[in-house]
Amino acid sequence: MSSGTLYDKVWDLHRVAELPGGSTQLFVGLHLIHEVTSPQAFSALKDKGLLVRCPERTVATVDHIVPTTSQQRPFADPLAEEMLSTLERNCQEYGIPLNNIGSGRQGIVHVIAPELGLTQPGMTVACGDSHTSTHGAFGAIAFGIGTSQVRDVLASQSLAMNKLKVRRIQVNGLLPEGVSAKDLILHVIRHLGVKGGVGYAYEFAGSAIEALSMEERMTLCNMAIEGGARCGYVNPDQVTFEYLKGRPHAPEGDAWTRAVAWWSSLATDANATVDDEVVFDAAAIPPTVTWGITPGQGLGIDETVPSLDQLDPGERPIAEEAYRYMDLQPGTAIAGVPVDVCFIGSCTNGRLSDLRAAADVARGRQVAEGIKAFVVPGSEQVAKAAEAEGLDAVFRAAGFEWREPGCSMCLAMNPDRLEGRQISASSSNRNFKGRQGSASGRTLLMSPAMVAAAAVNGRVTDVRTLISPSAS
């Protein structure tokens, strides 16, 4: 294999043909589907009399539309029930495995594929969901695709793609106590912009990245798309291999030994050239919260909402829109902003380590009066593991609701929604206007631990004041 970046190597291994116009037909090693973007794709297959090309490389789950308070069938929402029923019929007809409610394997698509060992280094992964970049944490190249492309992958197990440039995001040092991978990626997006990664794959590297757990790396790669990058990835290493070993779909025995050797060879070579490199100092990254209506409008917890003259000219129109929508004026300290709803979950931060971090803050404390706070595990496996550790009891004792797995309040496709002008402290990935279900609802993105801190204080809070020795 020639030297190069992991992106180059994986691209070359999956290249089928060069297409007219300069794009490449790329083989897809793993296709993940769910109930929202697959129905029209299956209908198109039926209209053309086509079969699913590789059902054994296709895996389904239900996540976006499922209620989290009760998942008894039929769902109260007839549209949600029809969407799941349609997915069930399509999977049965085409021989696609479905990780359904009650199977012990259901959950958010970007949570279950890694925990089942489906996502592996060197793969190309596609899914009709923006945050498919999550799987890059394993040294895979993972793309979110639209419904028409879901159809194409079902029919041909390939995609027409244009090759990206590679930007290395080098993060040196170690993150301070109380600062998480969520803070890191919000910090990166703040400084590079929501369009800064357009045309790029982001390679996350450096000692701070190497020190992250796999679940933290998934958080990082999950939000690469929010910085404009089509995908983000971390080179596979011992952390990757230890996470995968023993999972249901991971290789075993001699096959495992061979796989690890091959996976190791895929990492970016020391002499590889990247198209761009940006360096960050991990020690300088604070707990970070968004104040506006894009993930790039972030602030360190000790900062204030910027004035127009502090911003680049290109950032000013969206800032003015954010001032009006969020009702936050220049000079307002982000710490102390009151919240109404606190949501812990999503494909960004709904994994076991996320719940542990939030529970550490909630333990022995109480949700502030008038605050609605709830925790939604990212999968049935996460819920089971958290309950085995007693995390559900910690949250309930503190006044949080403990819910069933699903996408929940990350987006407005299920009953979990903001009302009116409510402000949410959310561990999800997007703070767009109306994203959480109310046309005027407001979202502040932050880490799960920061959400828990906001819940117990009723306002945006520096979590470091609650986890330091003097606070205990």
From Swiss-Prot:
Catalytic activity: (2R,3S)-3-isopropylmalate = (2S)-2-isopropylmalate
Annotated positions binding [4Fe-4S] cluster: 347, 407, 410
Pfam families: Aconitase
Pathway assigned in UniProt: Amino-acid biosynthesis; L-leucine biosynthesis; L-leucine from 3-methyl-2-oxobutanoate: step 2/4
Keyword Endoplasmic reticulum set for record: no
Keyword Ribonucleoprotein: no
GO biological process: L-leucine biosynthetic process
CDD domains, sorted: IPMI
Superkingdom per UniProt: Bacteria
A single GO molecular function term of this UniProt record: 3-isopropylmalate dehydratase activity
EC number annotated for this UniProt entry: 4.2.1.33
Function: Catalyzes the isomerization between 2-isopropylmalate and 3-isopropylmalate, via the formation of 2-isopropylmaleate.
Similarity annotation: Belongs to the aconitase/IPM isomerase family. LeuC type 1 subfamily.
NCBIfam families: leuC, PRK05478.1, PRK12466.1
Subunit structure: Heterodimer of LeuC and LeuD.
Protein name: 3-isopropylmalate dehydratase large subunit
Organism of origin: Synechococcus sp. (strain CC9605)
